[in-house]
Regions:
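N-terminal Rossmann-like dinucleotide/flavin-binding domain of flavoprotein oxidoreductases
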Residues: 34-84
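Glycine-/small-residue-rich beta->alpha transition segments that form the dinucleotide
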Residues: 84, 88-95
Length: 168
């Protein structure tokens, strides 16, 4: 199975339940695709996804992360090593708009913003400073669907962490 987003996980789970040996390839560093990086934690806690993935691993599904199919492994290699290949790679290319100033600094695609923020949060609580931050900025979101609302929520949501050490 190529891709570990919603369709990839569903396909892997169904095939595994029917007795097939299943390997899932994911180009990112974590399994889950859109579920892991595209939906903010305020809507879908990542520990829920991680719990499901751990159950799938215990049931025998193999996950290979950091593998970009087509670059790191060819289609010919996959077809040689596996009986069947299922493409569940989603739509990762953003839809651009033609507007004056579109190429100005500080304009980002929604998926890049959400992925960057979620990845930084998972990697260390936004301490890496490599993510796209909306802190202290005026933010305009074009689009009012789920993705637009996720961007608004991520932009205005204060992220703070308190590390508490309890005496033992």
């Amino acid at each position: 199975v190529i891709g570990s987003g919603p369709s990839g996980l569903a396909a892997a789970d169904q095939l595994n339940q029917r007795g097939h040996s299943v390997t899932v390839f994911e180009r990112e560093d974590r399994v889950g695709g859109l579920l892991m990086y595209g939906i903010p934690n305020m809507k879908l806690e990542k520990q829920i996804i991680e719990r499901k993935i751990n159950i799938m691993k215990e049931e025998g599904i193999e996950f290979r992360t950091g593998v970009n199919v087509g670059k790191d492994i060819t289609a010919a290699e996959l077809l040689k090593d596996f009986d069947r290949v299922i493409l569940c790679c989603g739509a990762s290319n953003p839809r651009d708009i033609k507007a004056e100033g579109r190429d100005a600094k500080g304009i980002y695609f929604a998926v890049d913003f959400l992925k960057s923020t979620t990845k930084a949060l998972l990697n260390g609580g936004l301490t890496d400073k490599n993510h796209i931050s909306a802190k202290g900025k005026n933010v305009m979101v074009i689009g009012g669907g789920d993705t637009g609302n996720d961007c608004v929520g991520t932009s205005v949501r204060p992220v703070s962490y308190t590390h508490l050490t309890l005496p033992t």
